[in-house]
């Protein structure tokens, strides 16, 4: 298996990490990708699950929490354990730690907001990815212009 492509989305102050995560999930789903969202905790997983139900009133992203729902699972699965099942396409890592299963994915997405804890943890992830010679892309996301 080829090394994963790594994408860091660096959010300016004023960009909500949870809302941006939902936006990325929605875009990837519409492009027919299958995603595994790795959360820091069960609470974060439940919060993201709830947010995806209300993120957009005009559309729906089929998703479930890992271990719940139908077999096969919908194209978007949210988990917090050290197991991503059979998902191989895109990993969105919302955890402060790097999951051991990241290598099974074609693409890994890391979302960096302005909190010191997230920035420090994801700097460590960046250094690790560099040490593995993974292809790394950085995307700066500007805050919406207030009118």
Positions of the model-derived regions?
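Long, hydrophobic N-terminal alpha-helical segment
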Residues: 1-44
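Short, solvent-exposed amphipathic alpha-helical segments in soluble enzyme
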Residues: 24-26, 52-55, 108-109, 125-128
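Short His-Asn-centered micro-motif
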Residues: 38-40, 79-81, 92-95
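Helix-adjacent hinge/juxtasegments
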Residues: 49-86
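SF2 helicase motor core recognition
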Residues: 84-104
């Amino acid at each position: 298996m080829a090394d994963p492509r790594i994408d860091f989305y660096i959010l300016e102050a004023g960009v909500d990490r949870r809302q941006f995560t939902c936006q990325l999930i929605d875009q990837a789903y519409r492009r027919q990708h299958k995603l595994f969202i790795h959360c820091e905790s069960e609470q974060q997983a439940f919060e993201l699950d709830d947010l995806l139900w209300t993120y957009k009133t005009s559309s729906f992203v089929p998703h479930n929490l890992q271990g719940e729902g139908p077999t096969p699972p919908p194209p978007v699965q949210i988990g917090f354990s050290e197991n991503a099942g059979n998902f191989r396409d895109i990993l969105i890592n919302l955890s402060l730690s790097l999951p051991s299963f990241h290598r099974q994915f074609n693409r890994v997405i890391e979302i960096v907001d302005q909190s010191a804890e997230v920035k420090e943890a994801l700097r460590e992830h960046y250094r690790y990815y560099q040490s593995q010679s993974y292809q790394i892309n950085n995307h700066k996301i500007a805050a919406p212009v207030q009118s």
